[in-house]
């Protein structure tokens, strides 16, 4: 009898446990459905405060969707998305670009916005994973007080002996702006536009000599050094350079006459996002005429939608020559090789 009672108790406990776990499974499915219908969105962003403040409140007002914004650096955010891939806590990653994320595209959902048709030809979503929304091209920031009448219009001008030791440049192995500036000079000086050609790297050798060993530790030090008059010219992003112009500093922004690179500041939908439809609405909103034009008129990032008006402190789009053969996917695949070549040429210059 005692044995039967024990057996009954065990079976009862097993039944309860099974019911509990079955209930948990059912609740998870219900939770997913509830989450999908919620008017909320979690955005992981590494963008500037000004850009976040332009886009997020406007999106909330227009859609009624509440945005939970997590702000951090690009590296930590990408690591977070990767660590959460089996149970995504975020819906959108608003950081980095294809060059940085190509090898991790399995972390993201394929989505091409209907607004993609309205973007510049070089800024369309060609992969399905990365949606270019704005661009921060690499430019020259020229201190007009120091440059005087000196011609600084393109990469050949940077080899002027008068600029030796007066060029602010970072380390392409550690600085994203320096790496993109390196890519621009490689495409500009490469034979038939080939960034791996001997001609491209011969130019790099001469450029390294004119920098005269003064490679800076951060992107910020480059544009600040030029604006403060420590250097005559710096190779940097357009955003900070245009900000100095906007604020009245004695500098000007120069897009190299040989060509410019427009790395798209992309937005990605996280694979398995709990609020997938809201995430798609966010991407659509980012590319909309309203937001692209507002950014062009008030900020110093470059909108990528066709026909958008820009503030007078921004260089008009029709005055910028773009490299037609620039391939962001190719650059992403060959980045390690290019950085290794840079390090090799830098080391050779010191011997």
Model-derived regions, located:
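Short, polar/charged alpha-helical segment
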Residues: 41, 45-66
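Mature extracytoplasmic/periplasmic domains
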Residues: 260, 265, 270-325
């Amino acid at each position: 009898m005692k044995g039967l009672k024990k057996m009954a108790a065990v079976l009862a406990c097993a039944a309860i446990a099974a019911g509990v776990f079955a209930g948990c499974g059912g609740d998870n499915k219900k939770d997913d459905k509830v989450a999908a219908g919620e008017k909320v969105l979690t955005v992981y962003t590494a963008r500037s405060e000004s850009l976040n403040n332009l886009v997020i409140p406007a999106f909330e007002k227009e859609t009624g969707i509440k945005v939970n914004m997590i702000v951090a650096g690009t590296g930590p955010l990408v690591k977070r998305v990767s660590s959460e891939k089996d149970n995504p806590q975020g819906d959108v990653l608003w950081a980095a670009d294809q060059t940085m994320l190509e090898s991790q595209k399995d972390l993201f959902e394929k989505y091409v916005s209907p607004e993609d048709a309205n973007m510049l030809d070089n800024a369309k979503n060609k992969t399905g994973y990365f949606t270019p929304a704005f661009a921060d091209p690499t430019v020259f920031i020229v201190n007009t007080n120091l440059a005087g009448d000196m011609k600084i219009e393109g990469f050949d001008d940077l080899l002027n002996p008068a600029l030796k030791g007066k060029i602010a440049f970072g380390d392409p192995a550690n600085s994203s702006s320096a790496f993109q500036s390196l890519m621009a000079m490689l495409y500009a000086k490469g034979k038939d536009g080939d960034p791996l050609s001997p001609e491209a790297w011969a130019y790099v050798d001469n450029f390294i000599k004119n920098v005269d060993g003064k490679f800076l530790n951060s992107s910020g030090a480059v544009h600040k050094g030029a604006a403060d008059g420590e250097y005559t010219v710096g190779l940097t992003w357009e955003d900070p350079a245009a900000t100095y112009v906007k604020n009245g500093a004695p500098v000007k922004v120069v897009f190299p006459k040989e060509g410019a690179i427009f790395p798209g500041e992309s937005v990605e939908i996280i694979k398995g996002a709990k609020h997938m439809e809201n995430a798609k609405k966010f991407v659509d909103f980012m590319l909309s005429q309203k937001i692209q034009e507002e950014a062009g008129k008030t900020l110093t990032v470059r909108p990528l939608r066709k026909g958008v008006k820009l503030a007078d402190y921004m260089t008009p789009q029709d005055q910028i020559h773009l490299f037609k053969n620039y391939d962001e996917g190719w650059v992403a695949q060959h980045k390690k090789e290019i950085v290794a070549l840079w390090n090799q040429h830098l080391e050779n210059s010191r011997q």
